A protein has these predicted regions:
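Extracytoplasmic/secreted proteins, especially bacterial periplasmic and envelope-associated proteins
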Residues: 51-54, 58, 76-87, 92, ...
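N-terminal Lys/Arg-rich, disordered targeting/topogenic segments
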Residues: 1-7
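Hydrophobic membrane-insertion alpha-helices, especially the h-region
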Residues: 10-27
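Acidic/histidine-rich catalytic neighborhood of metal-dependent amide-processing enzymes
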Residues: 128-205
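Soluble periplasmic/extracytoplasmic beta-strand elements of cell-envelope proteins
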Residues: 58, 106-110, 118-124, 159-165, ...
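N-terminal capping segment at the start of a domain
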Residues: 26-76, 126
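A non-catalytic alpha/beta surface segment that caps or lines the substrate-entry region
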Residues: 43, 57-114
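Solvent-exposed, acidic/flexible segments
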Residues: 45-52, 67-78, 118, 133-141, ...
Length: 205
């Protein structure tokens, strides 16, 4: 009798374990057909890829290292960003301040929205000393320009403000000489109603 009860208990335990295994399996399995390869790019995605590559190549490959040690290249990068905003049908402006006796420029443009709140989308365009800065941060600037082109001429709920910041790398990083710090201080002084800030930083290339 005890032997039968033990055998029955074992069968019940096995059935319970099997039930929970089936629950786990059905919960974890993905429905539908598995796709092992990426979907082909659309024509718009192919064009976007080409623009991103071209902008990174322009900043890192053609202009190269851009910081106060390479001041001419820093200004060339600022001119390129300003021109890219203009070619997208936007109206860029320079937020200029002086550092080490030299004029440094944050480049901004905006798409006015129906409400006064502002969303800032930013990326720094200077590179660390000794580097052409393809990933850090030509990749972020390329994305910034792509977003500006994408939203240009389209209605927006909140104002979209695109800003390319200067002097974010050491020795200015986390100091009051950073372009973004100078810019934020100016926004506060003006009373800008900034509701969010999105930083595009080192996103790969």
């Amino acid at each position: 009798m005890l032997r039968r009860l033990g055998l029955s208990g074992f069968r019940i335990a096995l059935a319970v374990l099997g039930f929970f295994f089936l629950l786990w399996w059905f919960g974890m399995r993905m429905p539908g057909r598995n796709i092992s390869t990426a979907a082909p790019l659309s024509a718009a995605e192919i064009a976007l890829r080409a623009d991103l590559i071209a902008d990174v190549q322009k900043l890192a490959g053609e202009i190269g290292e851009r910081n106060l040690q390479h001041y001419a290249q820093l200004n060339t990068a600022a001119d390129f960003i300003e021109g890219s905003f203009s070619r997208a049908g936007l109206q860029p402006r320079r937020d200029t301040y002086e550092l080490q006796g030299r004029a440094c420029h944050n480049i901004e443009t905006e798409i006015r929205g129906a409400r006064p709140q502002i969303v800032v989308i930013g990326a720094h365009y200077d590179s660390v000393f000794g580097s052409p800065g393809a990933n850090d941060n030509a990749s972020g600037v390329a994305a910034l320009l792509a977003l500006a082109r994408r939203f240009a001429g389209k209605p927006a709920g909140q104002t979209l403000r695109f800003v390319a910041f200067v002097n974010e790398e050491p020795p200015y990083f986390q100091t009051e000489q950073m372009g973004s710090f100078v810019y934020a201080r100016g926004c506060k002084a003006r009373g800008d109603q900034i509701s969010a800030m999105l930083s595009l930083e080192t996103i790969g290339y």
